[in-house]
A protein has these predicted regions:
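Topology signature of small-to-medium multi-pass alpha-helical membrane proteins
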Residues: 2-147
Length: 147
């Protein structure tokens, strides 16, 4: 007996995959930039009225947020690959991770704008659009057919 042919992957799923992957790459770049700049920024880059402990706190926060962006970028790229294959569980995980990332980055951009790098900030936009496209009815029907 021949195996049934799985349904053709819709274009909206491919577009969503590439958008999430683009956002993950931007998050990885922003995370690397944040981590390396936290370790290589000299004390003279800050105002003289800031204490050494305040400068240290800023640099630690920048490195921590950079590490979070790195881990999130790796997680999103893994989940996007599995989601592209039609696994419904990974699609849900990708969407929830995307929602958490968008909320986290925008709250941090409001409260601590010095800690978010521009690639990480711009990387949130394609991730949010891609996660939205994964939840559209055309792609949801394809995920249901794949199960």
């Amino acid at each position: 007996m021949t195996q049934p042919i799985p349904p053709q992957r819709p274009t909206i799923v491919n577009i969503a995959f590439w958008l999430v992957l683009l956002g993950a790459v931007l998050l990885l770049a922003g995370g690397l930039l944040g981590v390396t700049s936290a370790f290589t920024t000299p004390r003279s880059a800050f105002a003289d009225d800031l204490s050494d402990s305040a400068v240290h706190s800023i640099l630690v926060m920048r490195a921590g947020i950079g590490a979070i962006c790195l881990l999130t970028g790796m997680g999103l790229s893994f989940l996007a690959g599995r989601t592209r294959n039609g696994d419904l569980r990974f699609r849900r995980s990708l969407v929830w991770l995307s929602v958490a990332l968008v909320v986290l980055v925008f709250v941090l951009a409001l409260l601590a704008p010095f800690a978010i790098t521009l690639p990480a900030l711009f990387g949130v936009v394609p991730v949010a659009i891609g996660a939205t496209l994964f939840m559209r009815p055309a792609s949801s029907d394809w995920f249901q057919d794949m199960q």
